[in-house]
Amino acid sequence: MMGWNTVERNWKELKGKLKETWGDMTDDELDVIAGKREQLVGKIQTKYEIAREEAERQVNAFAHDCDAAKEPLKNVGEAVSSRQKSVKKRSLYT
């Protein structure tokens, strides 16, 4: 599962997805938040006038969705890496 540290490290790449999820967020607000989970939760809570628990739930769902989207790519990467190792082994024996 993608931890929040991974979301934070990939913040710039995820900005588009963040804006899709929370359309009222500005680029400037997202730049200030810069991947800090508690700041994102607080901003969602105040901007959308929702309970903190709901903001937490939304942020957790976002991280989970990012995780689910990256999982197939991870599997493809592992398959490619495995295939490359297999090809290298065969070329050593030919």
Swiss-Prot record:
It comes from the Bacteria. It holds the Pfam family CsbD. Residues 85-94 have a biased composition (Basic residues). SUPFAM superfamilies: Hypothetical protein YjbJ. Residues 74-94 are annotated as: Disordered. InterPro entries: CsbD (IPR008462), UPF0337_stress_rsp (IPR050423), YjbJ_sf (IPR036629). Belongs to the UPF0337 (CsbD) family. This is UPF0337 protein NE2439. The lineage of its organism: Bacteria, Pseudomonadati, Pseudomonadota, Betaproteobacteria, Nitrosomonadales.
